[in-house]
Curated annotation (Swiss-Prot):
UniProt superkingdom: Bacteria
Residues given in the record as Zn(2+) binding sites: H314
Alphabetical list of Pfam families matching this protein: Csd3_N2, LysM, OapA_N, Peptidase_M23
Gene: mepM
Topology feature Cytoplasmic, residues: 1-20
Sequence ranges on the Periplasmic membrane side: 41-440
Entry protein name: Murein DD-endopeptidase MepM
Cofactor: Zn(2+); Ca(2+)
Major site of localization recorded for this protein: membrane
Ranges for domain LysM: 96-141
The species this protein was found in: Escherichia coli (strain K12)
Function (record text): A murein DD-endopeptidase with specificity for D-Ala-meso-diaminopimelic acid (mDAP) cross-links. Its role is probably to cleave D-Ala-mDAP cross-links to allow insertion of new glycans and thus cell wall expansion. Functionally redundant with MepM and MepH. Partially suppresses an mepS disruption mutant.
């Protein structure tokens, strides 16, 4: 055997070097194949299943990434100071309103409020005309406590309103109502004696009409700071049927405070502008930071814990970012909350006008105080990891009329004005409305 081995070694050494390399490689490959034991699938084989017990923190580590523990129920809304104006803006509990504007579709409108895409598809199936919404039309809808759509109302025109109610089969049934009344313009005027709400009601405005006035003027006027003796004139178009008021629409408002006049005139697109056709809304930033950061947890009002099955809504968006990143106010407004609050950690809330509120949570340091006025882009805090948090991030929320919406898709205010033929038509309309807004 030794002689055979020496003969093989001698023959191997006498080979040219390239041949020796090739032969060696083939030898190694042959040995590898010889010791390899492949897994053979047998169709009828009984699988072996092992159950592994995990601790709760280990379970969480296997779940999709989230910046806040998903196995804990979210606390109730952090307290935001309320007043009687908020009651007028909020309207009926569970009812939300929206005026259709440029680029809107039924899907884009309802998606930002977290309404299920399946419901939107069912609505479109119930009435194909819902796919052709027009600028200035109004939608309103009712949700259950779990965020499920129960009813949608579409004001097609002053004369026609369509209602879509959920059926037992989880579809929607459409009914149409035609209004037969006569529309009449009414001027209601008065002087502020105490609160604006009480003064407006004394002048003959309904709660819904007071709400419409507050929304139209929200970017120009802080109604809480009106003084005794300030004057207002409101032009309403009201539908009368058999001597009763059926519905109304705000056409124009004039408010005089400390000797200065403020106007809001309705245009055909359903929005309000000043006498010159300039938009009243103050524009918002889309993101609360100077640069964009990775989203670690999305908006989901019906987020379900995959382990417990419990609904734990996530009412905002989480941005993963280094601690100490400057956090910016997305729009002009007033700081209404700046404090430390259990789950939210260091927390800031800003009110923009009367309809919009933004919230910023898990901060490391707060740079503003309650009552402070801020401008779009102002630094209000530094991001952190305080409160109930699994890592450094900013939790950011947008609320419209006390309803949380998706910050990434919500239709935010923009600074804009009318141009071209739209502006010419508006100026002609304003020329008729403004003279009617008299105080005498």
């Amino acid at each position: 055997m030794q002689q055979i081995a020496r003969s093989v070694a001698l023959a191997f050494n006498n080979l040219p070097r390239p041949h020796r390399v090739m032969l060696g490689s083939l030898t190694v490959l042959t040995l590898a194949v010889a010791v390899w034991r492949p897994y053979v699938y047998h169709r009828d084989a009984t699988p072996i299943v092992k159950t592994i017990e995990l601790e709760q923190n280990e379970i969480r580590s296997l779940l999709p990434e989230a910046s806040e523990p998903i196995d804990q129920a979210a606390q109730e809304d952090e307290a935001i100071p309320q007043d009687e104006l908020d009651d007028k803006i909020a309207g009926e509990a569970g009812v939300h309103e929206y005026v259709v504007s440029t680029g809107d579709t039924l899907s884009s409108i309802l998606n930002q409020y977290g309404i299920d895409m399946g419901d939107i598809t069912q609505l479109a199936a119930a009435d194909k005309e819902l796919r052709n919404l027009k600028i200035g039309q109004q939608l309103s809808w009712t949700l259950t406590a779990d965020g499920e759509l129960q009813r949608l109302t579409w004001e097609v025109s002053r004369r026609e309103t369509r209602t879509y109610d959920r059926t037992a089969a989880n579809g929607f049934k459409m009914t149409s109502e035609m209004q037969q009344g006569e529309w009449v313009n009414n001027l209601l005027k008065g002087t502020v004696g105490g609160s604006f709400v009480a003064s407006a009601r004394n002048a003959g405005l309904t709660s819904a009409e007071v709400s419409a006035v507050i929304k139209a003027m929200q970017w120009q006027m802080d109604f809480r700071k009106l003084k005794k003796g300030d004057e207002f004139a409101v032009l309403m178009s009201r539908e009368m049927l058999d001597g009763k008021r059926e519905q109304s629409q705000l056409l124009g408002v004039r408010l005089r405070s400390e000797g200065k006049d403020y106007y809001a005139i309705r245009a055909e697109d359903g929005k309000f502008y000043d006498r010159n056709g300039t938009g009243l809304a103050k524009g918002f930033l889309r993101f609360p930071t100077a640069k964009q950061f990775r989203i670690s947890s999305n908006f989901n009002p019906r987020r379900t814990n995959p382990v417990t099955g419990r609904v734990a809504p996530h009412r905002g968006v989480d941005f993963a970012m280094p601690q100490g990143t400057p956090v910016l106010s997305v729009g002009d407004g007033e700081v209404v909350v700046a404090k430390r609050s259990g789950a939210a950690g260091y927390y800031v809330a800003i009110r923009h006008g009367r309809s919009y509120t933004t919230r910023y949570m898990h901060l490391r340091k707060i740079l503003v105080k309650p009552g402070q006025k801020v401008k779009r882009g102002d630094r209000i805090a530094l991001s952190g990891n305080t409160g109930r948090s699994t890592g450094p991030h900013l939790h950011y929320e947008v609320w419209i009329n006390q309803q949380a919406v998706n910050p990434l898709t919500a239709k935010l205010p923009r600074t804009e004005g009318l141009t071209g033929s739209d502006r010419r038509e508006f100026l002609a309309q304003a020329k008729e409305i403004v003279p009617q807004l008299r105080f005498d």
